[in-house]
Amino acid sequence: MPVRAATDGRFKYIRSYIPYRQFALRNYYQWGMPSNKAWDKLVLGGHNTNPDWAQTFNAHPAEMLFDLEKDPGELHNLSDSPEYAEVLAKMRKALSEHIRSTKDLGFFIPTSRVNTTLYDKVRKEKYPLNELYNLVELAGTAKASDASVFEKALSSQYPEMRYWASVGLAQLGIKGELQVCPPTLLTLMNDADPYIACEAAYAAAYLGETSKGIERLNHPAKEADRKVGYSLLECLSLDKTMQPAIRTHLADLKEKAEILPRKANEDAGLMARGILVNLGEMDIKDLHGPESYKLGLKLNHGRRPMVPLPN
């Protein structure tokens, strides 16, 4: 999930290019911490009364602007405030120029990096980087009038264009600015690239094809690509409107949560367990399974007490 930021020392501008992707996707280390598990339980259990504490579990704005002097914790977004419109425009322009001047390669999907050096590739092949950047920036802030741009890009020869076109359509679906799923998007769910196929499926889930989209995310074309679909399914499972459709796959998810690997960040079994936690079908304390708890006890046995902390 690409995110870029810029600051002039006083204000900080953050641009999230896939704003519907929550920050609370679990990784192995952080969610092994008792504090993170308690945070999960507080918010997902419905006990939280502070909106700030729930931010990481929700979709977020495409653009955020913070006054670092008054708000060093970066909690109060000023991007919608008319008073700061000039500051926002200045920071947006600076960041947009920066990704172009540096030829930022962070918007390419993982499969485009296999057996190639992107730095050389985009220069030798004269890749249309500016066209890609335009599409990327449009996707996160998409309006209904942009739908035709995304639909055209769905058929691009470039995998990244197809991917970001799917992101743009997903954003429109989530915002309720597009209700009908373009036929090309449904076709794209069978794209040979799992990142494109799964992002298209995610978009379809918000464009009237919820069952088809979730079915595709839960059933990969290749087993090795299961983690790609599960990652997006974990995002969807934080949306209560999507949970009933995901529950139709509950038996399969529970089976995969037990039989698939769950010892590393991108292990599909760990992702399946995260989805079950979001659905309220598993307690967060069981996310890593009993074997991880026992291993932790074994690794830490005999270590000297850390209270008080060493000087």
Regions found by a protein language model. Name each.
Residues 1-80, 86, 118:
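C-terminal, low-complexity/hydrophilic appendages and adjacent surface loops
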Residues 47-62, 70, 78-311:
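Long, internal low-complexity/basic segments
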